[in-house]
From Swiss-Prot:
It catalyses: tRNA(Met) + L-methionine + ATP = L-methionyl-tRNA(Met) + AMP + diphosphate. It is found in: Cytoplasm. The gene is metG. One of its GO terms (cellular component) is cytosol. This is Methionine--tRNA ligase. Residues 582-688 form the tRNA-binding domain. Belongs to the class-I aminoacyl-tRNA synthetase family. MetG type 1 subfamily. Its cofactor is Zn(2+). SUPFAM superfamilies: Anticodon-binding domain of a subclass of class I aminoacyl-tRNA synthetases, Methionyl-tRNA synthetase (MetRS), Zn-domain, Nucleic acid-binding proteins, Nucleotidylyl transferase. It is an enzyme of class 6 (ligase). InterPro entries: aa-tRNA-synth_I_CS, Anticodon_Met, Met-tRNA-synth_bsu_C, Met-tRNA_ligase_1, Met-tRNA_synth, Methionyl/Leucyl_tRNA_Synth, MetRS_core, MetRS_Zn. Binds 1 zinc ion per subunit. Is required not only for elongation of protein synthesis but also for the initiation of all mRNA translation through initiator tRNA(fMet) aminoacylation. It comes from Cupriavidus pinatubonensis (strain JMP 134 / LMG 1197) (Cupriavidus necator (strain JMP 134)). The keyword Nucleotide-binding applies.
Amino acid sequence: MTARRILVTSALPYANGQIHIGHLVEYIQTDIWVRFQRMMGNEVYYVGADDTHGTPVMLRAEKEGITPKQLIDRVWTEHKRDFDSFLVSFDNYYSTDAEENRELCEKIYLALKADDLIAEREVEQFYDPVKNMFLPDRFIKGECPKCGAKDQYGDSCEVCGTTYVPTDLKNPYSVVSGATPVRKSSTHFFFKLSDPRCETFLREWVADLAQPEAANKMQEWLGSEGEASTLSDWDISRDAPYFGFEIPGAPGKYFYVWLDAPIGYYASFKNLAEKKGIDFDAWVGPHSTAEQYHFIGKDILYFHTLFWPAMLRFSGYRTPTNVFAHGFLTVDGAKMSKSRGTFITAQSYIDTGMNPEWLRYYFAAKLNASMEDLDLNLDDFIARVNSDLIGKYVNIASRAAGFLVKRFEGKVDEAALAHPLLKQLREAAPQVAQLYEAREYSKALRLVMELTDTVNAFVDTEKPWELAKDEAKRSALHAACSVSLEAFRLLTVYLKPVVPTVAAGVERFLNVEPLDWRAIDKQLSASSPVQAYQHLMTRVDAKQVDALLAANRESLQATAPAAGAAAAASIEPIADTITIDDFAKIDLRVAKIVECQKVEGSSKLLQLTLDLGEGRTRNVFSGIQSAYTPEQLVGKLTVVVANLAPRKMKFGVSEGMVLAASAADEKANPGLYILEPHSGAVPGMRIG
C-alpha cells in the first residue's frame, strides 16, 4: 500500500502566557494521531509555532520593560519545554515572527489583491490620546449601551449578553492608560469574504468536513443556498504602533494577527522543508496530493473554516483536507479556577512529579471525534490510571517476565506462540487502527482494555506463580510466560501512540526493534532473549494530586480580611428614584433552567432554555459563562425579566434577561451570581 503524505498542525499558542492543561488537550489529541500515522508507515510532518504578534504582546513587553522580541523568545523556550515534557512530537516548532512567515503573508496578500479580493475602507475607531494608538475591542471598557452594566469590554456585555461595536459603549475608557478615548478614522484593508466566488467555494468545501457539528455551523454562517450570503468582509489590518508585519505598500499598516497566525503553519513547514530538503510546493501547491489537517479548539472554528480556506484557495495554495475541532476542558465539572487550584499549568504538573503519560492516557480515554467538552475528574483520573495502566496493562509484564528470565534465560517458547489468545489480539488490529484514524480514542482504549482483561484472565487461569513451584510443570510455565509476554507486546503496539515512553521501555526489556503497526504480524523470538524486567510506571498517589492543586491555588488568605471592605467600596451608587408605576412595568418571574449550553464562538455567553410555566420554553442568552458551567445550572430556578422585548443577537434571539449580581468593579471584585428563589417557588411565579 502506498504511504500517505500528511501535513498536520495544532493551533498556535499565544506568546503571552503559560501552557496549561486546557491547551494540552489539543496537543495530546494531535500527537496521538500523528504517532499513529507514523506507526502506519505514512510520511507525516507535524508542525507548530508560537503565535507572536498583536497588541497584547506589545503591551506586555512594554510593561516588563523588554522588547517584544525578547518576550516572545523567552515564551517560545517555555512553550517548547512544556511540549517536550508532555511528549508532543513536533517535527518543527517555530515562530510566526519569522522571515518565512513575512514572505508568505506578503505573497498571499498580494495574490488576493491582484484577484480583486482586497478592499480599502475608512473605519472609525477609538483612539487612546495618551498612548497614541488605536484600541482593540478588548482594550476598551465602558458601560453597556443596553443594560448599563459598568466595566464591559468593547465587543459584548458579560451581564446581559448584548453584542455591539466599541463606539456604542457609554463612558468608554482605555484599559491601557485609563484615558477617555477619542473617535478617529483610519483606512483599513478587508479580505472580501462576501465575494460570490468565496461563497461558492465555501459551499463546496464544507461538504467535505468530517465533523457534523462543524458542517452545521458552517451552514449557519453561509445561510441557505439561494438566499443572500451572511458572510462579512474581514478586516485584516491594524494601525501602528503594532507588533507584526507591515503591509506592503501601506506604511503604518500591519497585518492583523489572525491573518499571519494560520499562515504560520506554512511558515513552520517551509522552515522544516528547507532544512530537510522537502519540496514545499509539492505539499502546499494547488495540485498537491498530500493531505493537510488542522486540529483546533471549537472556539476558533470560524477562522479555520471560513477565512483560512478561502485565503488559500484564492492565493494559489491547496486547501485543508479537513479541520478537526475539539471541545473545552473542565476540571471536576467546572471551569478551571485559580482559586481552586484547577487552573493547572504544564510546568507545575511536571514540577510536582506527575507522569505526563498519566494525563495523556486519561485525555485519550475521554477524547472522541466530536466537539463535545471533556472533564478531568481528578478522582476518576487517579482510579482510571491506576486501574487501567498499572493494575491491568503493566501488571501482565510484571507477572510473567521474571519467571521467563530466571528459569529460561529470557528465551520464549516459540511453539507456544500459536495460542488462540494471540490470534484474538491480532484480529483486533484493524478495528483499533480504524478508531485511531477516526480520532475515536476513547473507543480505541476501551477495546484495548477489554483485550487486556482477556489477557489477565489467561494469566489468572494459568497461574504461572503456581506452575513455578512444580518442576514437572516447567514446560507449562514456559508456555504461559511466553504467551503472556507476546500478548503484552501486542497490547503495547496498540497503546504506543498514547504512552510512547512506556512503549520505549517495553521495547528495551523485550529486546525488540521499535514497534510499529507491522509488528503485529511479527512475534517474540528465542534468538532475542527478553531482558530483566524494569519498572515501567508508578501508581498515581492522591497526595500528588493534592500537591498539584496546592501549587496552582492562588492564596486568598492575604486578601480575605480586606474582601468585605473592597466589595463595599465597589458598590455602585443607588440609581435615581422611580415610582411604583415604573417598577410595575417590570415583570419578574421564576424560571427553571431546563437546558443550558455554551454558545459557539463566544467565551462569555451561555444559551439557556427556560420554563416560565407558559406551556412553552424560552431561549435566553446570558453573559455568565465565566461563572458557571452548563452542568451547574441545569435544573436550577432563577429570576428572569419576562416582559423584556426580544432582541436579535449575533447568535440568535434572546427572549428575556436572567438576573445576576456583580460588583461595580469586576476587575477588583470578580464574580457573577445568578439570583435563585427559595425552595417552594415554581416556574411562572411573579416576583414583586
